[in-house]
Protein backbone atom coordinates (compact mmCIF):
# COMPACT_ATOMS: atom_id res chain seq x y z
CA UNK A 1 0.00 0.00 0.00
CA UNK A 2 2.83 2.40 0.82
CA UNK A 3 4.49 1.85 -2.57
CA UNK A 4 1.18 2.13 -4.40
CA UNK A 5 0.31 5.31 -2.50
CA UNK A 6 3.72 6.77 -3.28
CA UNK A 7 3.22 6.07 -7.00
CA UNK A 8 -0.21 7.71 -6.96
CA UNK A 9 1.14 10.78 -5.11
CA UNK A 10 3.99 11.05 -7.62
CA UNK A 11 1.56 10.87 -10.54
CA UNK A 12 -0.64 13.56 -8.97
CA UNK A 13 2.40 15.77 -8.29
CA UNK A 14 3.57 15.38 -11.89
CA UNK A 15 0.10 16.25 -13.18
CA UNK A 16 -0.05 19.35 -10.99
CA UNK A 17 3.44 20.47 -12.02
CA UNK A 18 2.56 20.04 -15.70
CA UNK A 19 -0.57 22.15 -15.22
CA UNK A 20 1.42 25.35 -14.61
CA UNK A 21 3.02 27.23 -17.50
CA UNK A 22 6.77 26.99 -18.01
CA UNK A 23 6.88 30.66 -17.05
CA UNK A 24 4.37 33.27 -15.94
CA UNK A 25 4.57 36.99 -15.28
CA UNK A 26 3.82 38.50 -11.88
CA UNK A 27 1.54 41.57 -11.98
CA UNK A 28 3.12 44.57 -13.65
CA UNK A 29 3.43 47.51 -11.25
CA UNK A 30 0.64 50.05 -11.51
CA UNK A 31 2.65 53.15 -10.61
CA UNK A 32 3.85 55.84 -13.03
CA UNK A 33 7.48 54.59 -13.06
CA UNK A 34 9.12 51.65 -14.76
CA UNK A 35 11.31 49.68 -12.36
CA UNK A 36 14.92 48.58 -12.74
CA UNK A 37 16.19 45.68 -10.61
CA UNK A 38 19.82 45.40 -9.54
CA UNK A 39 21.11 42.28 -7.75
CA UNK A 40 24.02 43.30 -5.53
CA UNK A 41 26.46 41.55 -3.22
CA UNK A 42 27.77 43.68 -0.34
CA UNK A 43 30.65 42.86 2.01
CA UNK A 44 30.86 44.36 5.49
CA UNK A 45 34.58 44.29 6.22
CA UNK A 46 33.99 45.69 9.71
CA UNK A 47 32.11 42.59 10.91
CA UNK A 48 32.81 38.88 10.99
CA UNK A 49 30.03 36.63 9.81
CA UNK A 50 28.19 34.46 12.34
CA UNK A 51 30.51 31.71 13.67
CA UNK A 52 33.13 32.61 11.07
CA UNK A 53 36.44 34.43 10.65
CA UNK A 54 35.30 35.77 7.28
CA UNK A 55 33.63 39.17 6.75
CA UNK A 56 29.85 39.23 6.60
CA UNK A 57 28.42 39.18 3.08
CA UNK A 58 24.88 40.17 2.17
CA UNK A 59 22.73 39.88 -0.92
CA UNK A 60 20.29 42.68 -1.72
CA UNK A 61 17.91 43.54 -4.53
CA UNK A 62 17.66 47.21 -5.40
CA UNK A 63 14.51 48.33 -7.22
CA UNK A 64 14.94 51.74 -8.85
CA UNK A 65 12.04 53.78 -10.25
CA UNK A 66 12.84 54.90 -13.80
CA UNK A 67 10.80 57.59 -15.57
CA UNK A 68 9.11 55.91 -18.52
CA UNK A 69 10.84 58.20 -21.02
CA UNK A 70 14.23 57.02 -19.73
CA UNK A 71 13.47 53.29 -19.93
CA UNK A 72 14.49 52.06 -23.37
CA UNK A 73 13.65 48.37 -22.98
CA UNK A 74 11.91 46.01 -20.57
CA UNK A 75 12.66 42.34 -20.01
CA UNK A 76 10.97 39.48 -18.17
CA UNK A 77 13.48 37.98 -15.72
CA UNK A 78 13.30 35.09 -13.23
CA UNK A 79 12.15 36.12 -9.78
CA UNK A 80 14.31 33.42 -8.16
CA UNK A 81 17.71 31.95 -9.07
CA UNK A 82 17.58 28.14 -9.49
CA UNK A 83 18.86 26.91 -6.11
CA UNK A 84 16.67 29.36 -4.18
CA UNK A 85 13.57 28.39 -6.17
CA UNK A 86 14.22 24.69 -5.61
CA UNK A 87 14.79 24.94 -1.85
CA UNK A 88 11.90 27.33 -1.21
CA UNK A 89 9.54 25.12 -3.24
CA UNK A 90 10.58 22.14 -1.10
CA UNK A 91 10.03 24.10 2.12
CA UNK A 92 6.57 25.20 0.94
CA UNK A 93 5.70 21.64 -0.06
CA UNK A 94 6.55 20.39 3.43
CA UNK A 95 4.83 23.28 5.21
CA UNK A 96 1.62 22.87 3.18
CA UNK A 97 1.40 19.11 3.62
CA UNK A 98 2.10 18.57 -0.07
CA UNK A 99 -0.44 21.10 -1.36
CA UNK A 100 2.14 23.50 -2.80
CA UNK A 101 2.81 23.29 -6.56
CA UNK A 102 6.36 22.20 -7.26
CA UNK A 103 8.16 24.41 -9.78
CA UNK A 104 5.90 27.40 -9.19
CA UNK A 105 8.65 29.70 -7.90
CA UNK A 106 11.06 28.75 -10.68
CA UNK A 107 8.42 29.62 -13.28
CA UNK A 108 7.69 33.12 -11.92
CA UNK A 109 8.98 36.19 -13.76
CA UNK A 110 8.94 39.93 -13.15
CA UNK A 111 9.11 42.59 -15.85
CA UNK A 112 11.90 45.08 -15.26
CA UNK A 113 13.47 48.00 -17.06
CA UNK A 114 16.52 46.35 -18.60
CA UNK A 115 18.03 49.32 -20.43
CA UNK A 116 18.15 52.92 -19.20
CA UNK A 117 18.95 55.91 -21.39
CA UNK A 118 22.58 56.90 -21.29
CA UNK A 119 23.14 59.78 -18.91
CA UNK A 120 20.31 58.92 -16.52
CA UNK A 121 21.88 57.79 -13.25
CA UNK A 122 19.65 56.30 -10.58
CA UNK A 123 21.74 57.76 -7.76
CA UNK A 124 22.86 61.06 -9.34
CA UNK A 125 22.95 64.50 -7.73
CA UNK A 126 23.54 63.01 -4.27
CA UNK A 127 19.83 62.80 -3.50
CA UNK A 128 18.75 59.96 -5.80
CA UNK A 129 16.78 62.47 -7.94
CA UNK A 130 14.81 63.36 -4.80
CA UNK A 131 13.57 59.77 -4.67
CA UNK A 132 13.45 58.28 -1.15
CA UNK A 133 15.26 55.05 -0.34
CA UNK A 134 13.22 52.42 1.50
CA UNK A 135 14.99 49.49 3.14
CA UNK A 136 13.03 46.22 3.38
CA UNK A 137 13.72 43.41 5.88
CA UNK A 138 11.91 40.11 5.11
CA UNK A 139 10.22 37.63 7.42
CA UNK A 140 12.16 35.23 9.62
CA UNK A 141 13.86 32.41 7.69
CA UNK A 142 12.47 34.01 4.53
CA UNK A 143 14.30 35.09 1.39
CA UNK A 144 14.08 38.66 0.17
CA UNK A 145 13.05 37.19 -3.19
CA UNK A 146 9.48 36.50 -2.06
CA UNK A 147 8.97 40.26 -1.74
CA UNK A 148 10.08 41.16 -5.27
CA UNK A 149 6.60 41.96 -6.58
CA UNK A 150 5.66 44.02 -3.52
CA UNK A 151 9.00 45.88 -3.66
CA UNK A 152 8.59 46.50 -7.38
CA UNK A 153 5.03 47.74 -6.91
CA UNK A 154 6.08 50.20 -4.19
CA UNK A 155 9.07 51.29 -6.28
CA UNK A 156 6.78 52.07 -9.22
CA UNK A 157 5.17 54.78 -7.08
CA UNK A 158 8.50 56.61 -6.88
CA UNK A 159 10.77 54.90 -4.34
CA UNK A 160 14.07 53.08 -4.45
CA UNK A 161 13.38 49.87 -2.50
CA UNK A 162 16.26 47.73 -1.25
CA UNK A 163 15.30 44.25 -0.05
CA UNK A 164 17.85 42.51 2.15
CA UNK A 165 18.76 38.92 2.92
CA UNK A 166 20.11 38.12 6.39
CA UNK A 167 22.49 35.12 6.08
CA UNK A 168 22.03 32.21 8.53
CA UNK A 169 18.53 33.56 9.23
CA UNK A 170 17.23 33.55 5.64
CA UNK A 171 16.43 30.00 4.38
CA UNK A 172 18.91 30.33 1.54
CA UNK A 173 21.19 33.12 0.36
CA UNK A 174 22.55 32.56 -3.14
CA UNK A 175 25.59 34.71 -3.93
CA UNK A 176 26.70 35.94 -7.34
CA UNK A 177 29.62 33.49 -7.53
CA UNK A 178 27.37 30.53 -6.72
CA UNK A 179 28.17 30.34 -3.00
CA UNK A 180 25.18 29.37 -0.89
CA UNK A 181 24.50 29.93 2.80
CA UNK A 182 21.51 28.07 4.17
CA UNK A 183 19.71 29.40 7.20
CA UNK A 184 17.09 28.23 9.62
CA UNK A 185 19.13 29.24 12.67
CA UNK A 186 16.34 31.53 13.89
CA UNK A 187 14.07 29.20 15.85
CA UNK A 188 10.84 30.85 16.91
CA UNK A 189 10.16 27.96 19.26
CA UNK A 190 13.08 29.31 21.31
CA UNK A 191 12.28 33.01 21.89
CA UNK A 192 15.46 33.55 23.91
CA UNK A 193 17.53 33.67 20.69
CA UNK A 194 15.33 36.21 18.92
CA UNK A 195 16.77 39.43 20.45
CA UNK A 196 20.22 38.36 19.20
CA UNK A 197 19.01 37.73 15.64
CA UNK A 198 16.95 40.91 15.74
CA UNK A 199 20.15 42.81 16.55
CA UNK A 200 21.97 41.07 13.67
CA UNK A 201 19.27 42.42 11.35
CA UNK A 202 19.72 45.90 12.78
CA UNK A 203 23.46 45.74 12.10
CA UNK A 204 22.77 44.52 8.55
CA UNK A 205 20.32 47.39 8.04
CA UNK A 206 22.74 50.07 9.23
CA UNK A 207 25.45 48.63 6.95
CA UNK A 208 23.18 48.56 3.88
CA UNK A 209 22.04 52.09 4.68
CA UNK A 210 25.65 53.26 4.84
CA UNK A 211 26.31 51.72 1.43
CA UNK A 212 23.22 53.34 -0.09
CA UNK A 213 24.12 56.76 1.28
CA UNK A 214 27.62 56.67 -0.21
CA UNK A 215 26.14 57.53 -3.60
CA UNK A 216 23.00 59.33 -2.36
CA UNK A 217 24.04 61.11 0.85
CA UNK A 218 21.04 63.44 0.88
CA UNK A 219 18.32 60.89 0.12
CA UNK A 220 15.37 60.59 2.50
CA UNK A 221 15.27 57.19 4.21
CA UNK A 222 12.39 54.98 5.31
CA UNK A 223 12.06 51.31 6.18
CA UNK A 224 9.58 48.47 5.87
CA UNK A 225 9.64 44.94 7.21
CA UNK A 226 7.41 41.88 7.29
CA UNK A 227 7.01 39.52 10.24
CA UNK A 228 10.41 39.29 12.01
CA UNK A 229 11.53 42.05 9.64
CA UNK A 230 8.91 44.31 11.22
CA UNK A 231 10.76 44.02 14.51
CA UNK A 232 13.96 45.01 12.70
CA UNK A 233 12.18 48.16 11.48
CA UNK A 234 11.42 49.41 14.98
CA UNK A 235 14.84 48.49 16.39
CA UNK A 236 16.69 50.00 13.42
CA UNK A 237 14.77 53.26 13.77
CA UNK A 238 15.66 53.44 17.46
CA UNK A 239 19.30 52.63 16.65
CA UNK A 240 19.73 54.97 13.67
CA UNK A 241 17.92 58.29 13.44
CA UNK A 242 18.66 58.55 9.72
CA UNK A 243 15.71 56.21 9.22
CA UNK A 244 12.96 58.80 9.33
CA UNK A 245 9.88 56.56 9.18
CA UNK A 246 8.94 52.91 9.22
CA UNK A 247 6.19 50.36 8.63
CA UNK A 248 5.87 47.02 10.41
CA UNK A 249 3.89 44.51 8.36
CA UNK A 250 2.36 42.08 10.87
CA UNK A 251 5.51 41.37 12.87
CA UNK A 252 5.91 40.67 16.58
CA UNK A 253 8.52 42.84 18.28
CA UNK A 254 11.77 41.87 20.01
CA UNK A 255 14.58 43.73 21.74
CA UNK A 256 14.83 46.79 23.96
CA UNK A 257 13.08 49.08 21.46
CA UNK A 258 9.73 47.64 22.57
CA UNK A 259 10.14 49.34 25.95
CA UNK A 260 11.54 52.67 24.72
CA UNK A 261 9.58 53.27 21.53
CA UNK A 262 10.14 56.15 19.15
CA UNK A 263 9.92 59.87 19.75
CA UNK A 264 13.04 60.61 21.78
CA UNK A 265 14.79 62.50 18.98
CA UNK A 266 14.22 66.08 17.89
CA UNK A 267 13.37 64.78 14.42
CA UNK A 268 10.03 62.92 14.33
CA UNK A 269 10.03 59.28 13.24
CA UNK A 270 6.46 58.29 12.33
CA UNK A 271 5.71 54.60 12.82
CA UNK A 272 2.92 52.51 11.31
CA UNK A 273 2.11 48.95 12.32
CA UNK A 274 -0.21 46.97 10.10
CA UNK A 275 -1.69 43.67 11.19
CA UNK A 276 -3.45 40.96 9.23
CA UNK A 277 -6.38 38.69 10.07
CA UNK A 278 -6.94 38.93 13.86
CA UNK A 279 -3.44 40.18 14.76
CA UNK A 280 -3.45 43.52 16.60
CA UNK A 281 -2.08 45.11 19.74
CA UNK A 282 -4.97 43.78 21.81
CA UNK A 283 -3.71 40.20 21.35
CA UNK A 284 0.02 40.81 20.83
CA UNK A 285 1.79 41.71 24.06
CA UNK A 286 4.79 43.18 22.25
CA UNK A 287 2.61 45.57 20.25
CA UNK A 288 0.68 46.61 23.35
CA UNK A 289 3.90 47.14 25.32
CA UNK A 290 5.27 49.40 22.58
CA UNK A 291 2.03 51.40 22.39
CA UNK A 292 1.92 51.99 26.14
CA UNK A 293 5.62 52.89 26.24
CA UNK A 294 5.18 55.49 23.51
CA UNK A 295 2.06 56.92 25.11
CA UNK A 296 3.92 57.24 28.40
CA UNK A 297 7.34 58.41 27.17
CA UNK A 298 6.53 60.12 23.87
CA UNK A 299 2.84 61.02 23.85
CA UNK A 300 3.16 63.32 20.84
CA UNK A 301 4.99 60.85 18.60
CA UNK A 302 3.06 59.89 15.45
CA UNK A 303 1.94 56.26 15.45
CA UNK A 304 -1.01 54.44 13.95
CA UNK A 305 -2.22 50.88 13.60
CA UNK A 306 -4.05 49.39 10.64
CA UNK A 307 -5.53 45.95 10.09
CA UNK A 308 -6.68 43.72 7.24
CA UNK A 309 -9.27 41.40 8.81
CA UNK A 310 -9.73 39.46 5.55
CA UNK A 311 -5.99 39.25 4.98
CA UNK A 312 -3.44 36.74 6.17
CA UNK A 313 0.15 37.02 7.36
CA UNK A 314 1.39 36.33 3.82
CA UNK A 315 -0.78 39.06 2.30
CA UNK A 316 2.32 41.21 2.83
CA UNK A 317 4.42 38.94 0.59
CA UNK A 318 4.46 37.81 -3.04
CA UNK A 319 2.64 34.56 -2.32
CA UNK A 320 -0.78 35.92 -3.39
CA UNK A 321 0.74 37.25 -6.64
CA UNK A 322 2.61 34.01 -7.36
CA UNK A 323 -0.47 31.89 -6.71
CA UNK A 324 -2.81 34.08 -8.77
CA UNK A 325 -0.42 34.66 -11.67
CA UNK A 326 0.39 30.95 -11.73
CA UNK A 327 -3.32 30.15 -11.77
CA UNK A 328 -3.11 27.59 -8.97
CA UNK A 329 -5.63 28.69 -6.34
CA UNK A 330 -7.93 25.79 -7.18
CA UNK A 331 -5.04 23.36 -7.53
CA UNK A 332 -3.69 24.20 -4.07
CA UNK A 333 -7.19 23.95 -2.62
CA UNK A 334 -9.43 26.26 -0.61
CA UNK A 335 -8.37 25.02 2.83
CA UNK A 336 -4.66 25.61 2.17
CA UNK A 337 -5.30 28.89 0.36
CA UNK A 338 -7.34 30.15 3.31
CA UNK A 339 -4.41 29.57 5.67
CA UNK A 340 -1.69 30.73 3.30
CA UNK A 341 -3.08 33.88 1.67
CA UNK A 342 -6.84 34.17 2.21
CA UNK A 343 -9.42 35.32 -0.32
CA UNK A 344 -8.16 38.80 -1.27
CA UNK A 345 -6.91 38.71 -4.89
CA UNK A 346 -3.28 39.69 -5.33
CA UNK A 347 -4.08 42.59 -7.66
CA UNK A 348 -6.25 44.10 -4.95
CA UNK A 349 -3.84 43.62 -2.04
CA UNK A 350 -0.90 44.96 -4.06
CA UNK A 351 -2.94 48.05 -4.89
CA UNK A 352 -3.98 48.96 -1.36
CA UNK A 353 -0.55 48.15 0.09
CA UNK A 354 1.02 50.45 -2.51
CA UNK A 355 -1.29 53.40 -1.92
CA UNK A 356 -1.16 53.27 1.89
CA UNK A 357 2.63 52.88 1.86
CA UNK A 358 2.88 55.78 -0.60
CA UNK A 359 0.68 58.10 1.47
CA UNK A 360 2.56 57.20 4.65
CA UNK A 361 5.98 57.99 3.23
CA UNK A 362 4.79 61.11 1.43
CA UNK A 363 3.51 62.32 4.80
CA UNK A 364 6.46 61.19 6.91
CA UNK A 365 9.34 61.96 4.54
CA UNK A 366 8.00 65.00 2.67
CA UNK A 367 5.57 66.56 5.15
CA UNK A 368 2.54 66.15 2.91
CA UNK A 369 -1.01 65.52 4.08
CA UNK A 370 -1.72 62.18 5.80
CA UNK A 371 -3.94 61.20 2.88
CA UNK A 372 -5.38 57.72 3.41
CA UNK A 373 -3.84 57.62 6.89
CA UNK A 374 -6.42 60.15 8.09
CA UNK A 375 -9.00 57.42 8.60
CA UNK A 376 -11.14 54.69 7.00
CA UNK A 377 -11.74 54.93 3.25
CA UNK A 378 -14.77 53.62 1.37
CA UNK A 379 -12.42 52.99 -1.55
CA UNK A 380 -10.42 50.47 0.51
CA UNK A 381 -12.87 48.87 2.97
CA UNK A 382 -10.45 45.96 3.51
CA UNK A 383 -8.23 48.28 5.58
CA UNK A 384 -9.40 49.13 9.11
CA UNK A 385 -8.04 51.54 11.71
CA UNK A 386 -7.57 50.51 15.33
CA UNK A 387 -8.28 53.01 18.07
From Swiss-Prot:
Major place of residence: secreted
Biological process terms in GO annotation: lipid catabolic process
GO cellular component: extracellular region
InterPro entries named in the record: AB_hydrolase_fold
Protein family per UniProt: Belongs to the AB hydrolase superfamily. Lipase family.
Pfam families: PAF-AH_p_II
Annotated EC: 3.1.1.47
Protein localization: Secreted
Top-level enzyme category: hydrolase
UniProt-annotated catalytic positions: 227, 250, 313
Catalysis: reaction(s): a 1-O-alkyl-2-acetyl-sn-glycero-3-phosphocholine + H2O = a 1-O-alkyl-sn-glycero-3-phosphocholine + acetate + H(+)
Keywords attached to this entry: Glycoprotein, Hydrolase, Lipid degradation, Lipid metabolism, Secreted, Signal
Molecular function as annotated in GO: 1-alkyl-2-acetylglycerophosphocholine esterase activity
Designated name of the protein: Probable 1-alkyl-2-acetylglycerophosphocholine esterase
Glycosylated residues, chain numbering: 51, 141, 283
Signal peptide: 1-17
Amino acid sequence: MLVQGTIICALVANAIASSIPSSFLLPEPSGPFKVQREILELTDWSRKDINSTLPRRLMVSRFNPIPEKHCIRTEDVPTFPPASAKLEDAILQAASGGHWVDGLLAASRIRVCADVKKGYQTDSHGDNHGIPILLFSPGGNTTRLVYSSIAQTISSAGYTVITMDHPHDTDIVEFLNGDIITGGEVTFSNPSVLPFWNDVRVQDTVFVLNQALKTSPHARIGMLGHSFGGSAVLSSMVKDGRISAGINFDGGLWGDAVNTGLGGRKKPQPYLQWGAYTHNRHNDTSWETLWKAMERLHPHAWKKELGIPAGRHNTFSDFPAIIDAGGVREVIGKASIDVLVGDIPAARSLEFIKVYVHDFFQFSLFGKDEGLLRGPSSKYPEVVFLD
